[in-house]
Amino acid sequence: MTGLRSDMITKGIDRAPHRSLLRAAGVKEEDFGKPFIAVCNSYIDIVPGHVHLQEFGKIVKEAIREAGGVPFEFNTIGVDDGIAMGHIGMRYSLPSREIIADSVETVVSAHWFDGMVCIPNCDKITPGMIMAAMRINIPTVFVSGGPMEAGRTSDGRKISLSSVFEGVGAYQSGKIDEKGLEELEQFGCPTCGSCSGMFTANSMNCLSEALGIAMPGNGTILATSPDRREFAKQSARQLMELIKSDIKPRDIVTEKAIDNAFALDMALGGSTNTILHTLAIANEAGVDYSLERINEVAARVPHLSKLAPASDVFIEDLHEAGGVSAVLNELSKKEGALHLDTLTVTGKTLGENIAGREVKDYEVIHPIDQPFSEQGGLAVLFGNLAPDGAIIKTGGVQDGITRHEGPAVVFDSQEEALDGIINRKVKAGDVVIIRYEGPKGGPGMPEMLAPTSQIVGMGLGPKVALITDGRFSGASRGLSIGHVSPEAAEGGPLAFVENGDHIVVDIEKRILNIEISDEEWEKRKANWPGFEPKVKTGYLARYSKLVTSANTGGIMKI
């Protein structure tokens, strides 16, 4: 093979020192002239979604060698959002996405690889690697580690990590005893893999199929299944074909491909975090994609599958029902729902990939003419409380609830809110405001899983709305509205809300408003003392200065 990118470090007299170093790293004489492939892994012992990825790296490298490439493996960092939840660790979660993107870009660009296999799985690792792939723009395929099996209680009921979080609230409100909580803890996470519901990790890994950067099966084949190992081999072999065809990420990730990703998101009722990450990916791909366009996708795409935490249906059930390809095939029956001509890493179009992939269980994936709702499972709200938008997972809201209005109960941090909820300062009908938790204010835009789980666990899920400039775990459900932009730390409207203010949430009309006179509003703005950064040293201080609000993906800009 000639004209390789890696020729930069392997060809010519002046590259003798480079070749000498490569020989020391194990490169043989016959390897020079073959494609050099970066195997970007994310194996880490403390993250259950990644503990098995060392094996995956070996499988991928062997498949690359067999297909005529020379693999070089390296690892990224990773943060487990569940373990980081509820303390300062969560402030590092979203910022870790930027570190991952920067580190992958650095390693691959410095060493002139010809192609890349990315092996992510959990929340920020997948989007971080995709962002890097858009920047580098060399042939790349994604192979996630696969979802965890659902847990099962002693009576056979399926559960997940969100069941454990909500179990804490149920225990504290006296709904279950300590033995009941212990059972949830013991069985909530039974295997390796990304947590078993339609949470952020599984949402992003499913969206990778619709986006076109991963082969069919990426989002739903279980981590423990032998099929996942075979999938890794096939994906590695396919990368070598992408190099021959010179198909690059930016050839695949276009505006229409992003429409398809959001269409799947709407059909599945995915995590709200997918919007944050996909907007960041669009930015790196050079695609100008607005929040308003997401509502346009939602308007034409029905909600076909309701998965945990919104139901007792899990990713393993979605896989058995036909997986992502079956969902997309069902969507394709509605004119205009998908762009079937978009290119994918298979070398075929999305339409060709999903042809004939029929639904096997219409209880799990509803027919196109019998959806859970005519509009998708995510929505963007606008109003005087969110001029630049806010996100709600409509698929996670209890059936029949489309509007909520009530008095604001204001907290200036997640910790303050959690304490207030536990101590019964929040009652039915209230609108909880948690502010100064955005990308800049948090810093790091921490997830609000603990407060939402506490609210649900106490039986207030359908009766209380929660609004924040922070974000939510994919395991969150209920009237949870996040990503409010501009954030409070930037002088956004949330900064001026006071206890007792009347807040209106109207999902059908896509409205998020505060009812207050212009005169009073201007008075509050004039008296706002400004925001004092919570962290003044280290990475989070730097991140806080450079990061944008959620409506642009929470990206870092100079």
UniProtKB/Swiss-Prot annotation:
GO CC aspect terms: cytosol
EC identifiers of the protein: 4.2.1.9
The entry's keywords: 2Fe-2S, Amino-acid biosynthesis, Branched-chain amino acid biosynthesis, Iron, Iron-sulfur, Lyase, Magnesium, Metal-binding
Record-annotated active site: 473
Name of encoding gene: ilvD
Record GO terms (molecular function): 2 iron, 2 sulfur cluster binding; dihydroxy-acid dehydratase activity; magnesium ion binding
Protein name: Dihydroxy-acid dehydratase
Alphabetical list of SUPFAM superfamilies matching this protein: IlvD/EDD N-terminal domain-like, LeuD/IlvD-like
